[in-house]
Design a protein with these regions (language model features):
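Structural motif
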Residues: 60, 70, 77, 103, ...
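A short, N-terminal "cap"/entry segment at the start of jelly-roll beta-barrel domains
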Residues: 1-48
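Short histidine-centered beta-strand/loop micro-motifs
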Residues: 52-53, 61-66, 82, 88-89, ...
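Short, conserved beta-strand element in jelly-roll/cupin
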Residues: 56, 65-80
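Short hydrophobic/aromatic-rich beta-strand segments that constitute the beta-sheet cores
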Residues: 63, 80, 114-116
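Short acidic-glycine-tyrosine-enriched beta hairpin
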Residues: 84-100
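Ligand-binding loop in jelly-roll beta-barrel domains
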Residues: 100-123
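Conserved short histidine dyad/triad with adjacent acidic residue
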Residues: 39-41, 48-65, 99-100
Length: 123
């Protein structure tokens, strides 16, 4: 059995596009549209590890993370406000991780694109 040990993200989006809003995503303002290109997915020991490219157009949504995520913004402007916290303005080159249970508001000021790595645990 051959095991793929390296996944290189293409410079431009490739492959099928997934359109559903992420789990825990509630639109507050505008009509944000999301597109996801998943470049890697692997189930292991009851968890799904996935990575790819995610895009979201302007709008505001509340989000409660049901997964762990690392992301790196490639383009756009995001105002991320943790529940009970101060707004953070993020742009190209900024990166962050969020733990399961993180909640807050995402205001996409200018269409964003990010590389992501997520880890979902069944349950």
């Amino acid at each position: 059995m051959e095991q793929k040990l390296l996944t290189v993200f293409p410079r431009q989006e490739q492959g099928p596009v997934l359109h559903p809003h992420p789990r825990g995503f509630t639109v507050i303002a505008g009509q944000p549209v999301t597109r996801t290109w998943r470049y890697f997915a692997k189930e292991e020991e009851g968890a799904l590890l996935a990575s790819g490219l995610w895009e979201c157009t302007e709008g505001t949504f509340a989000f409660r993370f049901q997964h762990w995520e690392f992301f790196h913004l490639l383009s756009g402007v995001l105002r991320l406000t943790p529940e009970g916290g101060e707004p953070l303005l993020l742009g190209p080159g900024d990166a962050a991780t969020m733990e399961v249970g993180f909640s807050g508001t995402w205001e996409v000021v200018e269409t964003i694109r990010k590389h992501f790595v997520t880890r979902y645990v069944a349950g």
